[in-house]
Structure formats: C-alpha cells, structure tokens
Amino acid sequence: YPVGVGKASTPTPSGYYRVETKEVNPEWIDPEDTENRIASGPGNPLGYRWIGFSGTYGIHGTNSPESVGGYVSNGCVRMREQDVEDLYSRIHVGTAVDIMYDRIVINADPDHTVSYYIYPDGYSRQYLTVGDVKKALAGYGVDTFEEAEHIQAKIAASDGSPTYVAKAYDLV
C-alpha cells in the first residue's frame, strides 16, 4: 500500500512493534492541545480506522488522500481510506508491525519482471550510491542490466517512480 509518513520534525519511528489497539471511527486528539478533539467524520484527519502500534503512533486513514506518499504526518503512517480498511480487516491485536526506513524498494512480479523505486531521503538517514542500488539489484540477478549513469539519475530524482529493469529467469 502507498503510505504517508511523519514530517522531518516528527518522523515515523522505525522498528518492530505489535498492533496494540484497533478502532473504527476514531476520535482525533490534537497532539499540541489535547483539549482540541475532532469526532469521527469527514473533518477527522485519522479517517475511519485506527491501528495503534506504539503509544500515540498508529496506522490510519486520512481525510486528505492527496497527502499519501509524502512526509506529512505527526509520526503516524497515513493510508488511503480503502487501503487502511482492507488492512484493518486482515490484522488483529498482536499482529507484528515492522516499520523500515528504506529508500530503495525492489519489486519482482510473478512474471519475473523486476523493477525498483528510489524514494526521497526525507529524514536524511540513508545516503544512496550507485553501488548500493547495484547491490540491491544483484539480489535479483539483474544488476548488469542497469547503467551507472541511469542509476545516478534515478538517485538524483528520488521521485518514487518505477524503473523496470528486466525479466529474471533461472536457466537450467
């Protein structure tokens, strides 16, 4: 699922957690002023589902779907409403939650098409080099299909757009 995460000033915490709470139609409580609350409804920034994983941190919907994909929250993981409702129905209290800060994502489709995505370094935590990307692609056997100049341009852009590399096959 695509997500929005915490701003640089309020980053989403990386680590291993477990779902602590689940709530339908949650009430939003302003982290700056706990007296300021918004009941469930179209004006609630949490949307209609809350999956709490660490104190005040959670995974939730949003009333601003255009914000998904950015560094926009107070540290929570923000999802499109239909996505969080799907996730909510699949998990239960106690389900493991693994939050990783990883700027490069490699995807291998069932038809063996390999693609990669490079995301912005919103927290200035993960400097990427061409070698880092090549090493990640090597794990899928497609590192020789990407030129260093093209990888460097993708790192410079860091826009999260897909780069389709090749179809990988094991030959016997």
Predicted regions: what is each one?
Residues 105-112:
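Short, Lys/Arg- and Gly-enriched loop/turn segments at beta-strand edges
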Residues 65-75:
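Short, basic/aromatic beta-hairpin or loop at an interaction surface
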